[in-house]
Amino acid sequence: MMTKAPATAVYDTLSLLFDFPNQEQRLWWHSIAPMFAAMLDTAGHNVHDQYRHLGIFKKHIIPFLGVYPAQGKHTWPSVLTRYGIPFELSLNCLDSVVRYTFEPTTEHTGTGDDSYNAFAILECIQKLVRIQPGIDMEWFSYFRNELVLNATESARLGRNDSVNQQPIRTQNKLALDLKGDRFALKVYLYPHLKSIATGVSSHDLIFNSVRKLSQKHTSIQPSFNVLCDYVASRNDPDSNAAEAEAGVPASALRARLLSCDLVDPSKSRIKIYLLEQTVSLTAMEDLWTLGGRRTDSSTLNGLDMMRELWHLLQIPSGFMKYPESDLKLGEVPDEQLPSMVHYALHPDQPMPEPQVYFTVFGMSDAGITNALATFFSRHGWYEMAKKYRVFLEGSFPNHDFESLNYLHTYVSFSYRKNKPYLSVYLHSFETGQWPAFSDDPTAFNAFKRCDLSLT
């Protein structure tokens, strides 16, 4: 009887074959690739696709991850994770789609040649365009011009010493959605530095850029106008005053970032991400229905599932803020972050589509895993209910899984065309049998099983 190959078999084989030009790239490979390989296997990718996607990761992505983070090393601080690590894996559990997101950097990032990391992404995309047909740069070029620092603004900020102390210096990041042997590329843009340089809020920069684009691409106007109306109602001073009188902190919705698909604009989605500081089921319900503007049967069916997921995850309610600084590598989190939502604007659709993000970072990973397994089983996704914990524990085999609280960052949920979508966003650093070699730096060792016997 044939036995199934281990989930990391492709990683093990490639590790025997690959050479690396430097120690930094070798560390990135062995830190991320075990979990990446296991996720591809969990999502049902065949072995040929696994080799292709891991090969692309090694050849075209790792060179743009920069200095490998370790205690005492200076690295570019990425907003992508609370630890400043510029890479994150995510898994759409119900559609079996693997995604990875990263902030490209080069040796010029943070120097006079590219003080605020505006150009590394262009070099990275040029590499990816050569191996994947269908990548379209029109909307990326437009939003980059609207939301990323230009040369004049960069020079102005360079004379402001306080900018280097900003918690957000990320301006852009890329994501690859892996489908079969292909990938779809999308870009995320953070206008925080542009806001400092221009004096215009990130929120207004994002909404103004989409408003201007909608004058040319009128097919996105209907859904964008609905979103503007909802956000304006949430940000109305009279509404906030009423909340304050009731003893509830005012919770305006503020845009944090924007993303778009790098495909033909007629098929691309624009996504506007907003922070919700009031963490509660009532707030999530309001985000889901756009304050009662979405009332169709599909929305209401999704609302029931979203409520169920909220109760299973047991997220504490309250008014949350982002901390001023990143966590140190290996630091065990003791914090709760705001919720988030993105609204997708599709051409020729009357309503924006919501995807809500349950921010579970800092909560028990075992508890989240059990909640997700229950949710999967209740709705007939028995295979994922069986596989998910096995995959996650196997990605951190030397840790006391019951003690961990930093593996899950978000659980996202959406409901489109009468179908639910649930994704998990995961800590993707020092995975597998880390350290791969005895002299590799180890930051996340607080709950390594080998340490427990010493306490």
From Swiss-Prot:
EC number: 2.5.1.34
Known pathway: Alkaloid biosynthesis; ergot alkaloid biosynthesis
UniProt keywords, alphabetically: Alkaloid metabolism, Transferase
Enzyme class label: transferase
Claim: Nucleotide-binding is one of the keywords in the record: no
Pfam families linked: Trp_DMAT (PF11991)
Binding site for L-tryptophan: V79, L80, E88, Y190, R256
GO BP: ergot alkaloid biosynthetic process
Subunit structure: Homodimer.
Family: Belongs to the tryptophan dimethylallyltransferase family.
Protein name: Tryptophan dimethylallyltransferase
Organism name: Claviceps fusiformis (Ergot fungus)
Source organism phylogeny: Eukaryota, Fungi, Dikarya, Ascomycota, Pezizomycotina
UniProt gene name: dmaW
